[in-house]
Protein backbone atom coordinates (compact mmCIF):
# COMPACT_ATOMS: atom_id res chain seq x y z
CA UNK A 1 0.00 0.00 0.00
CA UNK A 2 2.86 2.38 0.79
CA UNK A 3 5.49 1.48 -1.77
CA UNK A 4 5.53 0.20 -5.31
CA UNK A 5 8.70 -0.73 -7.17
CA UNK A 6 6.92 -0.71 -10.53
CA UNK A 7 5.95 2.94 -10.12
CA UNK A 8 9.08 3.88 -8.17
CA UNK A 9 7.04 5.16 -5.24
CA UNK A 10 7.68 4.99 -1.53
CA UNK A 11 5.38 6.87 0.82
CA UNK A 12 7.06 9.06 3.39
CA UNK A 13 6.97 8.31 7.08
CA UNK A 14 4.67 11.25 7.85
CA UNK A 15 2.12 10.16 5.23
CA UNK A 16 2.19 6.58 6.55
CA UNK A 17 1.65 7.77 10.12
CA UNK A 18 -1.25 10.03 9.10
CA UNK A 19 -2.82 7.24 7.06
CA UNK A 20 -2.43 4.49 9.67
CA UNK A 21 -3.53 6.61 12.62
CA UNK A 22 -6.93 7.18 10.97
CA UNK A 23 -7.79 3.54 10.28
CA UNK A 24 -10.66 1.78 12.02
CA UNK A 25 -12.04 -1.74 11.79
CA UNK A 26 -15.30 -3.07 10.32
CA UNK A 27 -16.49 -6.66 10.57
CA UNK A 28 -19.05 -8.15 8.19
CA UNK A 29 -21.00 -11.38 8.54
CA UNK A 30 -20.65 -13.90 5.71
CA UNK A 31 -22.68 -12.95 2.63
CA UNK A 32 -23.34 -9.34 3.68
CA UNK A 33 -23.50 -6.54 1.11
CA UNK A 34 -20.76 -3.98 1.65
CA UNK A 35 -21.36 -1.64 -1.28
CA UNK A 36 -24.36 -1.97 -3.58
CA UNK A 37 -24.63 -1.06 -7.24
CA UNK A 38 -24.92 2.72 -7.66
CA UNK A 39 -23.72 3.64 -4.16
CA UNK A 40 -20.93 6.03 -3.21
CA UNK A 41 -17.96 4.63 -1.32
CA UNK A 42 -17.95 6.03 2.23
CA UNK A 43 -14.50 4.61 2.89
CA UNK A 44 -11.44 2.84 1.52
CA UNK A 45 -11.49 -0.83 2.58
CA UNK A 46 -8.40 -2.93 3.23
CA UNK A 47 -9.14 -6.62 3.70
CA UNK A 48 -7.45 -7.92 6.83
CA UNK A 49 -9.16 -11.32 6.87
CA UNK A 50 -11.64 -12.99 4.53
CA UNK A 51 -12.63 -12.28 0.94
CA UNK A 52 -14.86 -9.88 -0.97
CA UNK A 53 -16.90 -11.14 -3.91
CA UNK A 54 -17.55 -8.73 -6.79
CA UNK A 55 -20.75 -9.19 -8.77
CA UNK A 56 -22.41 -7.55 -11.72
CA UNK A 57 -25.80 -5.91 -11.21
CA UNK A 58 -28.26 -8.66 -10.42
CA UNK A 59 -28.38 -11.64 -8.12
CA UNK A 60 -26.91 -15.07 -8.62
CA UNK A 61 -23.58 -16.87 -8.80
CA UNK A 62 -23.36 -16.28 -12.57
CA UNK A 63 -22.94 -12.57 -11.86
CA UNK A 64 -19.88 -13.07 -9.64
CA UNK A 65 -16.80 -12.21 -11.65
CA UNK A 66 -13.93 -11.54 -9.27
CA UNK A 67 -12.77 -12.26 -5.72
CA UNK A 68 -10.62 -9.87 -3.72
CA UNK A 69 -8.45 -11.91 -1.32
CA UNK A 70 -7.06 -11.12 2.11
CA UNK A 71 -4.62 -8.16 2.09
CA UNK A 72 -6.15 -6.53 -0.97
CA UNK A 73 -8.18 -3.33 -0.94
CA UNK A 74 -11.01 -1.57 -2.75
CA UNK A 75 -12.74 1.78 -2.99
CA UNK A 76 -9.63 3.70 -4.04
CA UNK A 77 -10.52 4.63 -7.60
CA UNK A 78 -14.16 5.24 -6.75
CA UNK A 79 -13.18 7.73 -4.04
CA UNK A 80 -10.31 9.41 -5.88
CA UNK A 81 -12.36 9.88 -9.06
CA UNK A 82 -15.76 10.44 -7.38
CA UNK A 83 -17.38 7.42 -9.04
CA UNK A 84 -20.39 5.45 -7.87
CA UNK A 85 -20.08 1.69 -7.69
CA UNK A 86 -20.83 -0.14 -10.92
CA UNK A 87 -20.73 -3.50 -9.14
CA UNK A 88 -21.85 -5.16 -5.93
CA UNK A 89 -19.21 -5.78 -3.24
CA UNK A 90 -20.18 -8.57 -0.84
CA UNK A 91 -18.39 -10.48 1.93
CA UNK A 92 -17.57 -14.11 1.15
CA UNK A 93 -20.03 -16.80 2.19
CA UNK A 94 -17.81 -18.97 4.37
CA UNK A 95 -16.44 -16.69 7.11
CA UNK A 96 -16.48 -13.21 8.61
CA UNK A 97 -14.79 -10.39 6.73
CA UNK A 98 -12.55 -8.09 8.73
CA UNK A 99 -11.52 -4.82 7.09
CA UNK A 100 -9.49 -1.81 8.08
CA UNK A 101 -11.09 1.35 6.74
CA UNK A 102 -10.20 4.95 6.03
CA UNK A 103 -12.99 7.50 5.61
CA UNK A 104 -13.56 8.90 2.14
CA UNK A 105 -13.03 12.46 3.38
CA UNK A 106 -9.79 11.55 5.17
CA UNK A 107 -8.36 9.86 2.08
CA UNK A 108 -9.13 12.97 0.02
CA UNK A 109 -7.61 15.18 2.73
CA UNK A 110 -4.41 13.09 2.71
CA UNK A 111 -4.23 13.39 -1.07
CA UNK A 112 -4.42 17.18 -0.76
CA UNK A 113 -1.78 17.28 1.99
CA UNK A 114 0.66 14.98 0.15
CA UNK A 115 0.85 15.84 -3.59
CA UNK A 116 3.44 13.15 -4.39
CA UNK A 117 1.21 10.51 -2.83
CA UNK A 118 -1.81 11.93 -4.69
CA UNK A 119 -0.05 11.60 -8.03
CA UNK A 120 0.93 7.99 -7.33
CA UNK A 121 -2.38 6.84 -5.83
CA UNK A 122 -4.48 8.44 -8.58
CA UNK A 123 -2.34 6.81 -11.29
CA UNK A 124 -2.44 3.41 -9.61
CA UNK A 125 -6.18 3.71 -8.92
CA UNK A 126 -6.82 4.46 -12.60
CA UNK A 127 -4.87 1.36 -13.64
CA UNK A 128 -6.79 -0.74 -11.11
CA UNK A 129 -10.06 0.59 -12.54
CA UNK A 130 -9.01 -0.33 -16.08
CA UNK A 131 -8.06 -3.86 -14.98
CA UNK A 132 -11.31 -4.38 -13.08
CA UNK A 133 -13.36 -3.16 -16.05
CA UNK A 134 -11.40 -5.51 -18.33
CA UNK A 135 -12.24 -8.47 -16.08
CA UNK A 136 -15.87 -7.37 -15.90
CA UNK A 137 -16.15 -7.15 -19.71
CA UNK A 138 -14.50 -10.55 -20.11
CA UNK A 139 -17.04 -12.04 -17.70
CA UNK A 140 -19.92 -10.38 -19.57
CA UNK A 141 -18.67 -11.86 -22.84
CA UNK A 142 -18.50 -15.28 -21.22
CA UNK A 143 -22.07 -14.90 -19.91
CA UNK A 144 -23.31 -13.79 -23.33
CA UNK A 145 -21.72 -16.83 -25.00
CA UNK A 146 -23.21 -19.10 -22.34
CA UNK A 147 -26.67 -17.57 -22.89
CA UNK A 148 -26.34 -17.96 -26.67
CA UNK A 149 -25.53 -21.65 -26.27
CA UNK A 150 -28.53 -22.09 -23.94
CA UNK A 151 -30.88 -20.36 -26.38
CA UNK A 152 -29.76 -22.65 -29.24
CA UNK A 153 -30.55 -25.80 -27.27
Pin down the residues of each PLM region.
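Regulatory nucleotide-sensing modules
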Residues: 1-94, 105-106
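Eukaryotic low-complexity, acidic/Ser/Thr/Pro-rich regulatory regions of large signaling scaffolds
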Residues: 62, 76-131, 135
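Cyclic nucleotide-binding regulatory module and flanking cytosolic helices
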Residues: 1-33, 111-150
Amino acid sequence: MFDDDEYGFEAGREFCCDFLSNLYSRIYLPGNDIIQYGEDFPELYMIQEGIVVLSLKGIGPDNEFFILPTYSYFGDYQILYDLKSQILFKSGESKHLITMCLKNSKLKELMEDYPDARKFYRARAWHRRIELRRRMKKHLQKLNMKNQVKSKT
